[in-house]
Structures are given as structure tokens and as C-alpha cells.
Amino acid sequence: MHLARLVGSCSLLLLLGALSGWAASDDPIEKVIEGINRGLSNAEREVGKALDGINSGITHAGREVEKVFNGLSNMGSHTGKELDKGVQGLNHGMDKVAHEINHGIGQAGKEAEKLGHGVNNAAGQVGKEADKLIHHGVHHGANQAGSEAGKFGQGVDNAAGQAGNEAGRFGQGVHHAAGQAGNEAGRFGQGVHHAAGQAGNEAGRFGQGAHHGLSEGWKETEKFGQGIHHAAGQVGKEAEKFGQGAHHAAGQAGNEAGRFGQGVHHGLSEGWKETEKFGQGVHHTAGQVGKEAEKFGQGAHHAAGQAGNEAGRFGQGAHHAAGQAGNEAGRFGQGVHHGLSEGWKETEKFGQGVHHAASQFGKETEKLGHGVHHGVNEAWKEAEKFGQGVHHAASQVGKEEDRVVQGLHHGVSQAGREAGQFGHDIHHTAGQAGKEGDIAVHGVQPGVHEAGKEAGQFGQGVHHTLEQAGKEADKAVQGFHTGVHQAGKEAEKLGQGVNHAADQAGKEVEKLGQGAHHAAGQAGKELQNAHNGVNQASKEANQLLNGNHQSGSSSHQGGATTTPLASGASVNTPFINLPALWRSVANIMP
């Protein structure tokens, strides 16, 4: 609005300039025109200065923004380098960890070899002791015809409830397959593992347990130092080994088997307990899913109701899988842990086996050299001591505690106990409550101590290796943390640089804004000056016109011409009275 009026005023003044030739040299109109020209020139110069200031501010801000981006690029590059250093440190730490683990595995292999030698030595010692002691246990067969055959250092095992044959080999256990003919394969120092109810496969390696499958056809073969495995309810075989326990077949009249220096454990048609001692394994499966745990050189493992395979480790117990199909894989020095039909936890220690509990929650804890075995259909716990095995039978909740070279045996269909003294075989016959105790002169096998020492050394070697690997892993983690920390510092620096650059850019933008405001303010001042110049010219023109008008025609005094134009840009008041102007021009002309 002001600019339009300014242009209009300029046009008018140009018109007045054309008339200036008619005026005298000291004509007031000429002064008006000169004042207007000076005001316009000053305004133009001020506007030019304002535009120059704005351009300068924009250029300076652009430079500062460019500096900000350069700083960001530099910090990003530096951070990338630091991250590379951190990753390299982490890789180096991982290489050390892998190297130490490989070294530890080699060391563990050596220790395992020592352990194997110790086991062989212990087995030889046991054999010598067996030569000294010639003791047989008498085993009673109940409710069915059965044959019993005893070999040197073995007990006679009775098969009850079905026709069965029993064959014992020196240093071997008796293995019974239930529900179907079955086979079991065992290796030295291992337990035999039984899988029931479905077809399963079992593979045993040195230091592992052999696994038995029930309800489908399989074989049972055992080697020295293995446990006895029982299967219930069908025709089966039972074999006993030296230093092992007898296994009872349930659901019918039961059998009792005694071992060298061991007790016979009987369980029939109801829940029962089975306990094993070092060199023994009593394994019961009766009328329900049951499980069996074995100890060093012994233990039989039973799996019921579903297919399962079990793999055992050197010097460990066998692990039972029941109620569902499952496979178990064991590693050196470790046990395989299977959980069935419900969730549970299993914890094991080195040299221990993990034993399965079926159909309910169960926990199992094991100590070195023994396994914990859980019974089926109810939740329970079993704890074993070295040289002992706690075995629970199915259909009832029960616990069993063994002491070394003693067996506590429970009879079926009637309440009965069997207590054996060291060197006793306790045999129970089913259908009546009774006790049988045989006292014999047995020896304790010293090979256990030797094997225990070797196992201890092995465990120490493994722990040492794991500790070393743990240290290396700690170093790797520390290196990684260091790299991350360094990268964090660099990122922090980057963030600081970004913040600084942003602050700087903000300052520059602020300066730019201030410069723009200043330039705008300056331009506003110049425009005000221009308006002031126009107003001044208008005042002079009005004064001139008013003076001429007063001398020429008093009828038009005052009026709008007396309105001062100090406001210049007043909205509705014209700053020149055109009729008075023309009258003044006419009066001036001769």
C-alpha cells in the first residue's frame, strides 16, 4: 500500500518537474522535487544495503553448515575405525577361546584314557577278588516253573510269572526283556538301558550304556561291569553278571536273583523299590512304567510305554525314557537326560548319569559315581550315595536308600522286608511275606577305590580345562567390552561433535536471522526515511500551495490543504490537493 502511494507520488512529482521550467529559479516547486529525489535516492541506497546484508548472512550460514557436515563425516569415519578395532579384538579373543577349548579337549582325552586304564585295573582287581570268593546265592522261583543256572561268582535268578530261562555268565548280569523278546547291548563300565513300549534303538560306546528296547524284538547282551535289565510281564531271559544285582520280573510271580556280595531285590504287582550298590544294579519294571538306574559298572535302565533310545557315557548311569518317544544322546563324562510326559528338570554332575522320571514332574539329582532314578506315575525324588543306587518302582511312590554292600528289598503282594548284611544275598519270594538272608563270606572289591581315584583325576582335568576356557572366554568378553566401550567413547565424541556442530549451526542460523532482521530493520528504516522524504516534500508543497491559495482566493482557505502530511502514509488523506495545485500554477504563470 505504501509502495503504491510512493509510486503515485513519484509520478506526480515528475509531472511537476515538467512544469518546473515555467517557474522561476527560486521556485518552491523545484525544491519539492529535489527533496523527493533525494529521499528516493536515500531509500534506494538503504534497500541495497539491506539486500547486501541478507546475502552476506546467507553466505556465512552456508559456510557454517558446510563445516558441520564436514565434522560429522570426520567423526563417522573415526567411529568406524574404532569399531573395526573392537571387532578385531573380539575375533582375537574368540580365537584364543577356541584354542584353549581344543587344548582342553585334548587334555580331557588324556584324562579319559587314564580313567579307562583305572577302570581296567579295577576290573582286574575285582576279578581277583572273585577268585577268592566263591559264593552263590540261592534264588527261589515262584508260581511258575523256572530254571536257574548259576555260574561262578553269580547268583541264581528266578523267572516268575512266565516260563523263563536264565543264563548267567561270569561277570555278567541277567537281563530280562518284557513284553517282547528284546536284546540289550552293553559295553564295559556301562549300564544297560531299556526302552519299553515302542521300538527303539540303542547304541553303546566305550564308557556308555547299552540301551534296551521293550515291546519290540531286540537282543540283550552285556559285558562285564554292566547292569541287569529287567522286563516284566512276558517271557524273558535273565542273566546275571558278576557284581550285579538280580532283576525281578513283575506282574506274575517274581523271581529273585542274588549277586556276588549283593542283595536280591524283589518287586511284584505293586510299587516297589529297588536299590543298587556299587557293582550291582537292581532294576525293576512291574505292572507299570518303571525305571532303573545304574552305577559305575552297573545299573540297568528301563524305558516303558514309548520308544526311546538312550545313550550313556563312560562311567555313568543309564537314563530312562518313558511314556513318550525320545532319544537321548550322551557326551563323554555326561549323562543323558530325558523328560517324559511332563516337564521336569534334571541336573547332573560329572561322572553321573541322569535318570528319567515319567508321567509326572520329577527332579533328579546325582552325585559322582551314581545316578538318580525316578519312578513313574507319581512324582518323587531319589537320591543316591556313591556306590548306591536308589531305584523306584512304578505304581506307587517310594524311595529307597542303600548303604554300601547292603540291599533293602521289598516283597510284593504282602508286606515284607529283606535286609542283607555285608556278604549276604537276600531273596524274597512272591505271594507271601518272607525274608531270606544268606550270609556268605564276601570280599569288598578294592578296584572301586582305584577307579574312583582315576575318575577324580579325570574330573579335575575337565574342571581345569573348563576353568581355562572360562578364563579365555572372560578375556574375550572383556576385549569385546573394551571395544564396545571404546566405540561408545567414539560415539560419544561423535555425538558431542554433532551437538557442537549443531550448536554452531544454530548460532550461525541465529546470526543469519539476526542479520536478516537487522537488514530488514535497516530496510524498514530506509523505507521510513523515504516516506519521511516524501512527507517532507508534501509538506513543502502544501505550504507552497497554501501560501499561493491564500494570496489568490480566500474562498478556499484551509480545507484539506491545511492537513499536514507528516503521517505521509495516512490511509484516506491525499498528500496533495490537486485543484489547489492547478490554481497555484495558474496564478504563477504570467
From Swiss-Prot:
Residues 190-200, 243-254, 297-330, 546-559 have a biased composition (Low complexity). Residues 1-25 form the signal peptide. Its main location: secreted. Detected in thymus, uterus and esophagus. Keywords: Secreted, Signal. It comes from the Eukaryota. Induction: Up-regulated in differentiating keratinocytes. Transmembrane segments: none annotated. Residues 182-213, 242-266, 297-338, 545-570 are annotated as: Disordered. GO terms for cellular component: extracellular exosome. Pfam families: SBSN_GxHH_rpt. InterPro entries: SBSN_GxHH_rpt, Suprabasin. It is found in: Secreted. Residues 560-570 have a biased composition (Polar residues). PANTHER family: SUPRABASAL-SPECIFIC PROTEIN SUPRABASIN (PTHR23243), SUPRABASIN (PTHR23243:SF3). This is Suprabasin. It comes from Homo sapiens (Human). The gene is SBSN.
